[in-house]
Structure formats: structure tokens, C-alpha cells
Amino acid sequence: MPTVFKIGAYRFFFYSGDRDEPVHIHVEKEDNVAKFWLDPVRLQKSGGFRAREINDLQKKVQDNQEQIIEAWNEYFNN
């Protein structure tokens, strides 16, 4: 599970087996998880996060979209 970055208690990562899916990022905090597609940035699924947190997380994903895509390509294209 490569971690792309952390912001506070949130960990942004992807799974090694995610190669066959479109570019996306998982976010976790404690037992809460979410998955965002990146092109365009949109929520795919969520478990445990409140709506306000999801909105904040989506903004963080948008703000770091380029970094996430670069990390994805570097990991899966090597």
C-alpha cells in the first residue's frame, strides 16, 4: 500500500493491485475510508466520513491531483 502523502490524520494511498483501474486515490483516517477517481476528481465510495469531511477531502485531492497522478504513474509504470 504505497502512501502518496499524509495531511494531518489522513493518509492518501493506493493499493499495489489497483493497476487495472483508472487513476484514483484512497483516503483513510482511523476506520473511515474513501476512494476518489482523479479524472475528473469525484467520490467513488465512502465509509464513515461525514459529508463535510468528504468535501474537504475532495478539495485536498483536487489540490494534489498532479502529485497523485505522478506517484501513480511512477509506481505502476516501473
What spans do the regions from the language model cover?
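Alpha-helical interaction segments
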Residues: 4, 26, 62-66
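Feature detects long, helix-prone N-terminal segments enriched in hydrophobes
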Residues: 11-13
